[in-house]
Regions:
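Surface-exposed, low-hydrophobicity beta-strand/loop segments enriched in small/polar/acidic residues
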Residues: 1-108
Length: 108
């Protein structure tokens, strides 16, 4: 999901009952973030983006991306989270250190 080698991630624990795929926005409580609101004014309760796939039944330890550049096409394909314009705008407000790109032909 990364589009750059320069990023910051913090350790945290996934508390979901099922596996969560890389690229999904997460809360510090270890839950999947939820986007809410009307088109054009959505908000999201995200604190970062899950850096790697995590199955909490096997090992709940994870890395939460809090600063860096992500390839939204890769993140969406991995996580099934919808990275539309409203979600990206809400994510940038919630986690200002995350930059979303989708026009990347070669990743670092």
């Amino acid at each position: 999901i990364l589009a750059s080698n320069d990023y910051t991630a913090i350790p945290f624990t996934v508390t979901e009952t099922a596996a969560v795929k890389a690229g999904y926005p997460m809360t510090l409580a270890g839950k999947k973030a939820v986007a809410a609101g009307e088109t054009g004014s959505k908000t999201i309760n995200a604190d970062g983006i899950l850096l790697y796939d995590v199955d909490p039944a096997e090992n709940p330890n994870a890395s939460l991306l809090i600063r860096g550049v992500i390839d939204t096409k890769k993140a969406a394909a991995s996580s099934s989270f919808t990275y539309d314009a409203d979600a990206i705008k809400a994510l940038k407000t919630a986690v200002p250190g995350i930059f979303c790109r989708d026009n990347i032909s070669v990743n670092a």
